[in-house]
UniProtKB/Swiss-Prot annotation:
There is a cross-link at residues 248-274 (Tryptophyl-tyrosyl-methioninium (Tyr-Met) (with W-126)). Keywords: Heme, Hydrogen peroxide, Iron, Metal-binding, Oxidoreductase, Peroxidase, Signal. It comes from Shewanella frigidimarina (strain NCIMB 400). GO terms for biological process: cellular response to hydrogen peroxide; hydrogen peroxide catabolic process. This is Catalase-peroxidase 2. The keyword Zinc does not apply. Gene3D superfamilies: 1.10.520.10, Peroxidase, domain 2. Homodimer or homotetramer. Belongs to the peroxidase family. Peroxidase/catalase subfamily. GO terms for molecular function: catalase activity; heme binding; metal ion binding. Heme b binds at residue 289. Pfam families: peroxidase. Bifunctional enzyme with both catalase and broad-spectrum peroxidase activity. There is a cross-link at residues 126-248 (Tryptophyl-tyrosyl-methioninium (Trp-Tyr) (with M-274)).
Amino acid sequence: MKHPLFNQKVLAGFVSMLLISGSAFASNNEKSEMTKPKGAVGTGVALENQARTNQFWWPDQLNLSALRDHDKRSNPYGENFDYAKAFNSLDLDKVKLDINALLTTSQDWWPSDYSNYGPFFIRMTWHSAGTYRTLDGRGGAGGGQQRFEPLNSWPDNASLDKARRLLWPIKMKYGEAISWSDLIVLAGNVSLENMGFKTYGFAGGRHDDWEPDMVYWGPEIEMLASDREDNGGKLQRPLGATHMGLIYVNPEGPKGVPDPLGSAKNIRVAFERMAMNDEETLALIAGGHTFGKMHGAHKPKDCLGAEPAAAGIEEQGLGWKNKCGKGHSEDTITSGLEGAWTQAPTKWTSLYLSNLLTFEWKQTRSPAGAIQWIPTDESLHKAVPDAHVKGKFHAPVMTTADLALKYDPEYRKIAERFLADPEEYRLAFAKAWYKLTHRDMGPSRNFLGKEVPKESLIWQDPIDDKTQSNIDADGVQELKAQILKSNLTVSELVRVAWASAASYRHSDMRGGANGARIALSPQKDWSVNNPAETAKVIKTLKAIQEDYNDSLFSKSKVSLADLIVLGGTAAIEKAAKDAGFTVSVPFNAGRGDATQAMTDINAFSLLELTSDGFRNYFDAQQSYKSPVDMLVDKADQLNLSVPEMTVLVGGLRALDANYKGLKHGVLTSTPGTLNNDFFVNLLDMSTVWKKSSTDGIYEGFDRQSGHKKWTATSVDLVFGSNSELRAVSEVYAFDTSKQKFVEDFAAAWTKVMNLDR
C-alpha cells in the first residue's frame, strides 16, 4: 500500500529536475559533450558534481561510515560542554510554566485543536521515543533524531515539523540548558499534566545529536511499503515497525486490510520489540488515544506538498504544505484518518476504553479515503465536538488497530480490568509512558532533574549500591597477584572480561561490566560466552573475592564486577610482559553487583549477541548481516573508531581470545602473548589465501611450499582485503609499531571496560 502523504511525484520531479537541468556549475554545452563508455545504458549521469560513495560502485563494499559518524567536531557547543551541568542549572518549573502557556496560546500559522496543543505534543513525544527497538537498542528519544532525515519526513510524522516549530521559542529562550531531545519529551509530559493526568516522572540527560543516525530502518525503497516479513510472516530482525515510515503498525490494518485480529498480531510484535508487554501496550495505546484527534480532512494527493526533506528551500525545513481550504484547522491532513476517539479530547478520562468496549462499530472511510470505524448507533454520531468549528459535532472513531484491543482476547481482558479500575489504568499508563520515553537512557544514574522517581525500575538494570568496590591501589595489586596465581589462563581471563564488558550497547546504554550480570541468567548461558568456561572463571574469581573481602587485614571490599575486569587487566599486562613489552592497563574500581532479582531475564535476553567478530563468533541463523558487517555493527555499539576496532581484533587474536579457543585468525606462534603478529602475518605476501570446503572459513598456504599455515574467517581477512582497514593494519604491522600496538590495544581495551560508567 502506498501512502498518499509521501509525495512520490514531487520527489521524482525534484530528482528529474536535477538530472535534466544539471547544476549551476555545468553548462548545457558541457553536458552535450559528455560521453559514456561503449555499451553503457542510460544517461550515465546520477547527480552532477556530486561525489559518489564506494557503495555506489561496489554495493558489497564494507561500509565503515558508522565508525566515523557523530564526530565531536559536529557539535557546535564544543568538546568541553557539560550538558549535565547545564541542565542541572535549569529552573525546570519555569520551563514547564512556559510550555503550559504555549499549550493554550494558539498560533494563526498552525492553530491548535480544541484550543490546546497538548495532544499534538503528546504525538510528537510518542513518535520521538517510539522508534526505539529492543533487538539492537536503536531509535528512541535520545539525540533528538526526529529533527533529521529520514524521521522528520516519515509519513507517520506528518505535521510534527510544526510541533517542533511551536516549541522553538522555548528552546531559543533556554538554549543549551535543555536539549531538543529533553524538551520534546518534557513537552509531552507537561501536556499530559495540563490535561489532568498525573505523570510518573521525568528525567533529563539526553544529549542532542547534530546529524542523522545511520540506522537500518528496513529493506523497502518506498515509504509505507512493507516487505520485511519472512515466508512464515515473522518480522525481520532487528526491525520493530511493520512498514517503512511508520512508528509501529498500519492503523488501517495489516498492509491496509481491516482485520482487527491480524492487527493485534502486528501490534503485539511491534510493542514486544519495543520492550512492552501486553499490559503496557494496552495502557499506552488507550492512554495516548484518549487525547486529540486524527486528521484526514481531504485526500492528501490532492492537497499536500512534499515532505520536509523534499520541499523547496523556501519552506525552510517545513513540509506537507496544504493547499486545500485553510491549509490547517478543519482542513488539516496528516494520516488521512479523521476524527477523535473520545468525547473529551483534552481531558484524561476512561472514555476511550468505555467507547471501545461498549459501542458496536461499523466500517467507514474518512474524507481522505482511509478505512476507519464509527459506532453503529447513529445517536452517537454527534457526540464529539469539532476541534475548530463551534457548534459542529462528529461521531467518535476507532481505527482497525484500536479495534484489535477489543477483539484480541488477551488485550480485551486487560481493557476490561482497566475500565473497572481507573486508578490501576492511570498508574499503568503513567509507568508505561515513563518507560516509553526513558527506555533508551540506560541506567538511572544517567537520569537528571528533580522529577526523577526515587524507585529504580527493573528495566533500568539496577545495581546494588552496597556492593560497590572501594579498593585502593594496594588492594588492586594484591588482587591482580592472586588472580595470576590461580588456575586461570590469560585467554580465559581475557575472554570472560571481554564478554562481560562487550555486552554494552551504546545505542541504549544497556549491558556492560557493571553489575557482573555475566554471572547471572540469562547472560551466563549465552552461547557466545561459552557457559562452561564462564562458570569456571566466575567460580574462581568468586573464591578470590570472598577470601579478600573476609580477610581480617582487608580494609576494603571488591565487587565481582570489578574483579572480572581486573582479571582481564592482569592478564593483558602479563601477556604484554611475556611478549617483551611493559604496559600499565588503567583500572578504576567502583563497580557494583546486581542480583538475579534485579535482572529482567526476558528484557536482558534481547542483548544476547548473535555475532561478535572480536571473538570470531557468528550465528548465521540469528544474525541479520554478514560477519564483517556485524563486526562493524558491534564496533559501532561499542563506540569504537576504525583504529580501535582494528587494534582490538588484532590483539584479541594474539591473546587467543576466540570463542571456545577456535584458532581461526590466531596468526601467531605464541598465542596468549600480546604482540602484533596478527597484522604482520596477515599482510605477509608469502601467504596465499583460499576458500576452504567449510563455508566461511579460509586457509592460508605458503606460496612456495603449499604448506597450510593458518585458518581464518572473513572477519580476519577483511583487515587485509578492505583498503581502509588494510591501511590501518599496515600501521600496526610496522617494525616500529610494536610498542604502539600494545599501548593502543590497552587504551582501546580500557575504553570498552568503562563504556557503561
